[in-house]
């Protein structure tokens, strides 16, 4: 018969040379759909996720999801990890959706909304990564503490003012393990016959 006839058909598609699945952690920045939204760079992503010490059954909030690069990396660690990427800007939320689809991640949920208001509608988290707080860091930490007083939280800060504010805010809570780490990353780039280290 022909394929124009009605009936049940079965089709097998084989890829003779599939791309090998990476066994390493860490995706290159170029792997992500970027747009004009700021993105946490590769080396900082890996350190931040390492400091979170996620477990296979973790539930994690990524507050200020941006492009979704951190959310994607966390979700790829295990199918059992549930990641909620929270983003209030529509352009950024759309990028997270596109990156979620690109990497086929069913365990990554994009939450369009502002933290901390939308956090109480989500399943309680065991971990939280704060890449951007929109100026609401004290309120966000208050809600996180109420949701789970033993939640492990990693906060990225670019300015000295934000870093100082974080240590000031943390004094309000009985923090079991407080750690402040300064990370500087430079990448070599060609300038004529020379290579210059450029800050990331």
Residue map of PLM features:
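S-adenosyl-L-methionine
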Residues: 86-125
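Conserved SAM-binding loop of SAM-dependent methyltransferases across substrates and taxa
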Residues: 67-79
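Conserved S-adenosyl-L-methionine
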Residues: 76-83, 147-149
């Amino acid at each position: 018969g022909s394929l124009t006839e009605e009936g049940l058909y079965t089709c097998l598609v084989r890829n003779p040379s599939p791309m090998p699945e990476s066994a390493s952690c860490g995706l290159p920045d170029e792997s992500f759909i970027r747009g004009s939204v700021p993105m946490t760079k590769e080396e900082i992503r890996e350190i931040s996720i390492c400091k979170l010490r996620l477990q296979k059954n973790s539930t994690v909030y990524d507050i200020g999801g941006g492009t979704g690069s951190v959310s994607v990396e966390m979700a790829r660690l295990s199918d059992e990890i549930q990641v909620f990427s929270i983003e209030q800007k529509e352009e950024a939320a759309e990028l997270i959706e596109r990156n979620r689809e690109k990497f086929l991640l069913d365990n990554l949920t994009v939450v369009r909304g502002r933290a901390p208001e939308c956090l109480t509608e989500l399943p309680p988290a065991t971990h939280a990564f704060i890449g951007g707080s929109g100026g609401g860091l004290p309120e966000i930490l208050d809600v996180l503490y109420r949701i789970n007083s033993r939640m492990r939280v990693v906060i990225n800060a670019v300015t000295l003012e934000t870093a100082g504010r974080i240590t000031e805010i943390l004094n309000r809570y009985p923090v079991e393990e407080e750690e402040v780490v300064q990370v500087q990353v430079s990448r070599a780039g060609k300038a004529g016959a020379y290579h210059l280290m450029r800050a990331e």
